[in-house]
Amino acid sequence: MERIKELRDLMSQSRTREILTTTTVDHMAIIKRYTSGRQEKNPALRMKWMMAMKYPITADKRIMEMIPERNEQGQTLWSKTNDAGSDRIMVSPLAVTWWNRNGPTAVTTHYPKVYKTYFEKVERLKNGTFGPVHFRNQIKIRRRVDTNPGHADLSAKEAQDVIMEVVFPNEVGAQLLTSESQLKITQEKKEELQDCKIAPLMVAYMLERELVRKTRFLPVAGGTSSVYIEVLHLTQGTCWEQMYAPGGEVRNDDIDQSLIIAARNIVRRATVSTDPLASLLEMCHSTQIGGIRMVDILKQNPTEEQAVDICKAAMGLKISSSFSFGGFTFKRTSGTSVRREEEILTGNLQTLKIQIHEGYEEFTIVGKRATAILRKATQRLVQLIISGKDEQSIAEAIIVAMVFSQEDCMIKAVRGDLNFMNRANQRLNPMHQLLRHFQKDAKILFQNWGIEPIDNIMGMTGILPDMTPSTEMSLRGIRISKTGVDEYSSTERIVVSIDRFLRVRDQRGNVLLSPEEVSETQGTEKLTITYSSSMMWEINGPESILVNTYQWIIKNWETVKIQWSQDPTILYNKIEFEPFQSLIPKAARAQYSGFVRTLFQQMRDVLGTFDTVQIIKLLPFAAAPPEQSRIQFSSLTVNVRGSGMRILIRGNSPVFNYNKTTKRLTVLGKDAGALMNDPDEGTTGIESAVLRGFLILGKENKRYGPALSISELGNLAKGEKANVLIGQGDVVLVMKRKRDSSILTDSQTATKRIRMATN
């Protein structure tokens, strides 16, 4: 206050004011500071000072022809005075206003296309809903987030090539655009931006925004998808939050979300197959998300989630060095440990073989709803500082940390036997056995852990065994903090290996991920996920299995047909029929299979009884191991729509309906495709069934007279030759076999020979 008074007194004297306003500043240090370098040292002041002048702007002389000297109010818009040091003229800010109102207009069609990301953002904000503001302590943790909604996922290099090709096509040699997405985007953008008058550099900047994911490491308390991050400054402060629902979704968020769902489904399905790794790769390669191949997305998308990382590891891609346990992400921040296998006894005297980590280590632990710092020594939790959204989340994190610490009192708290199984009915490894046990009920664990008095430290409280907060006592080594623990910020990726059971290890052999870590949460994907692999047909329930199985048979009918007549066993063992078995009542599988296989054998043996529709309809039932019996069926039952539905051996039913006129098959009312050749001729399909006992010699030979129909063939004597009309109106020359013994081989050669003879 004294100082201010003194200054006021000084300023009231006119001499002070005069000195301050008229004296030159000749202190060398000050002059140096404000004149060295091109960088403006005080931009705000400079701007104010410039705008206070009459003509703060310079412009090209041509402006004198384009703008009148005075506006409607008679104010001068430009001065004839030249700008010192250049041949430009001095212009008033009013000229800008005049230009904006009366200047020439440009074609605006390209603006929404070039500035697409901005236009879309405005729409999202206009349609978004801002809710009430709540004042409360915000536990924010820094996470790597996507700050750029609406982008494709190209790498910087790929984007650069696309931009050069679109914006500066003549500046460079032909760009090597390799990926599907690069080519698609380039073509789209070239069409959109034809005759675009916007400065190329600006177009390039804007294209970069559209093509590349921009991530930043920001403190976040709520949603982390890019449509929330773009309004972060509006939705959360230090002590307040504002509810917000975005006014639109963007494809990049949808891809991230759908990728996680697809990866989880694939890992879960692969776990239960005989060769999990091979199955996982087959599924990743045959799946599409929103019309883009999943493997292409995996290569470009930086999403870090357990299932996604397992898929990446299987493809030989690098992943983050952090590891996962109990659904939390662990990152070692200091210390080292060596592993030693040891047998330990649980409280139930069950022996467990556990890899004990010896040594002092510190970790950050980050989950969706709780974060923590853990310091541990060999089989000892030294300190756990934890923060979380609510009691439940904090408890989850404490259990994970206690199990991870491998403390003896945790192992001794086990009651009952540990025999948890994974989806493939294999026993879980011991650490996950313990985790599952305490996730079910941690009461004894918390009770046996022990409590200690605590010091009063700012921002820290204690937590009691019943998970209530306390300022006096706390579980041994455990404190609750008001501030969150930041996610691991590094984007470093490491080379990993994966074994056939999908366990991912770093180069030192530490397990980073395993299928046990994949979340069981079910979600609905935002983009269409198309699983072409038969292993995923069951994902959408029984109806989907039914439709997909029949679609597959129809799509591959040419090969199926040949196998049906030549190698039925190989056909019956096809993996594509596996999902279908789950629809057949267990008790009936073997009987149905035996019945259908016998029926098929009769078709092969008896001339002219080949019936395409019937083979397609019954084929999936022949896949189960057969049981020979005399039972005849007129219909077969499948369990769909919550009850048994019948497929008739002869004729149509709601489950399987073939329309002779349109030649299309509908399964449960859904179209399953068209049959190319007419299934009604008892003689079509591969003529092998018909031409048993005949040798196909080659193309038609007129010497042997007009073509006979198949029914007339029976009249030939052994060794006699004749032309015969088969299936699709082709004529071939055949000879009736002299010996019956070789009849079986005919069906195999017939197929090949008919092909050769008719081509």
Swiss-Prot record:
InterPro entries: Flu_PB2_2nd (IPR049110), Flu_PB2_6th (IPR049114), Flu_PB2_C (IPR049115), Flu_PB2_CAP-bd (IPR048298), Flu_PB2_middle (IPR049111), Flu_PB2_N (IPR049106), INV_PB2 (IPR001591), PB2_helical (IPR049113)
Subcellular location(s) of the protein: Virion; Host nucleus
Gene Ontology BP terms: 7-methylguanosine mRNA capping; cap snatching; DNA-templated transcription; symbiont-mediated suppression of host gene expression; symbiont-mediated suppression of host mRNA transcription via inhibition of RNA polymerase II activity; viral RNA genome replication
Motif (Nuclear localization signal): 736-739
Keyword field: Cap snatching, Eukaryotic host gene expression shutoff by virus, Eukaryotic host transcription shutoff by virus, Host gene expression shutoff by virus, Host nucleus, Host-virus interaction, Inhibition of host RNA polymerase II by virus, mRNA capping, mRNA processing, Viral transcription, Virion
Keyword presence, RNA-binding: no
GO molecular-function terms, A-Z: RNA binding; RNA-directed RNA polymerase activity
Assembly information from the UniProt record: Influenza RNA polymerase is composed of three subunits: PB1, PB2 and PA. Interacts (via N-terminus) with PB1 (via C-terminus). Interacts with nucleoprotein NP (via N-terminus).
Designated name of the protein: Polymerase basic protein 2
Organism: Influenza A virus (strain A/Equine/Prague/1/1956 H7N7)
